[in-house]
Amino acid sequence: MRLSEILAVALVTGATAYDLPDNLKQIYEKHKGKCSKVYQKGFTNGGHSDGKSFEYCGDIEGAIFMHSSAKGGQYTNMDVDCDGANNSAGKCSNDPSGQGVTAFKDEVKKFGIPDLDANLHPYIVFGNEEHSPQFKPQKYGMEPLSVMAVVCNGKLHYGIWGDTNGGTSTGEASLSMAELCFPEEKPDGDHGHDDNDVLYIGFTGKDAVLERVPLEGKKTEDFEDSIKSIGDKLVAGLKA
């Protein structure tokens, strides 16, 4: 799908949280308990609960997801990331750890903007660098700015892989993604979603990569709607 087509879709579609298809419901329940194909373990959820029980898992063919072995098996939380352009604007103004750049700033520049904006772009922080343990999703076929699926609050949302974590914590997404998932919790730069019930799914392979990313959009909902057709196709291909 090219940029002009994506923007046209964005203009005629409405914002909504998407219902979970049956296969994703089954995946959510089935893979909560145990990960058999652990790519890398030893991560935290950014807090003190459940220790270093969080891991990157490859049990779903064509995908990578976050999982925790604690409490009989669970997923992870959603801390708020405000890195990138306008990192101190709006509800990001109280972010204690925000940085002015994302990990994929150079890739983003190719699409005509200086960087992702956490207030606008629903992106996911996925992968860990600089500290041990590390995990690089590119090694398993994910590509920067590729579409990701997020199961949160009993619904499905779509975003892009937009940043990595410089430490060993997991479970982080942009402010705009947190607002899509948990509007009733009123997230901001210093407050996210604490429960470990969020399933982040990254897709491997070229089908998840957009030919043109609609980064020029003015509303988060327009951005999400514009990548929905790609996300739906990717999710439909997942098997529990």
From Swiss-Prot:
Q: What's any one GO cellular component for it? A: extracellular region
Q: Give a GO molecular function annotation for the protein.
A: chitosanase activity
Q: Which residues form the signal peptide?
A: 1-17
Q: Name one GO biological process term.
A: polysaccharide catabolic process
Q: Which residues are glycosylated?
A: N86
Q: What is its EC number?
A: 3.2.1.132
Specify whether Plastid is a keyword of the entry. no
InterPro entries found in the cross-reference section:
Chitosanase_fungal
Catalytic activity reported: Endohydrolysis of beta-(1->4)-linkages between D-glucosamine residues in a partly acetylated chitosan
Its EC top class is: hydrolase
Q: Which controlled-vocabulary keywords does the entry list?
A: Carbohydrate metabolism, Glycoprotein, Glycosidase, Hydrolase, Polysaccharide degradation, Secreted, Signal
The entry's localization annotation reads: Secreted
The entry's function note states: Chitosanase catalyzing the endo-type cleavage of chitosan, the deacylated form of chitin. Chitosanase may be crucial in the degradation of the deacetylated portion of chitin in the fungal cell wall. Chitoolisaccharides produced by the hydrolysis of partially N-acetylated chitosan are known to have many biological activities, including antibacterial activity, immune-enhancing effects, and elicitor activity.
Similarity comment text for this entry:
Belongs to the glycosyl hydrolase 75 family.
Instruction: From the Swiss-Prot or TrEMBL record, give the protein name.
Output: Endo-chitosanase B
Instruction: Name the gene.
Output: csnB
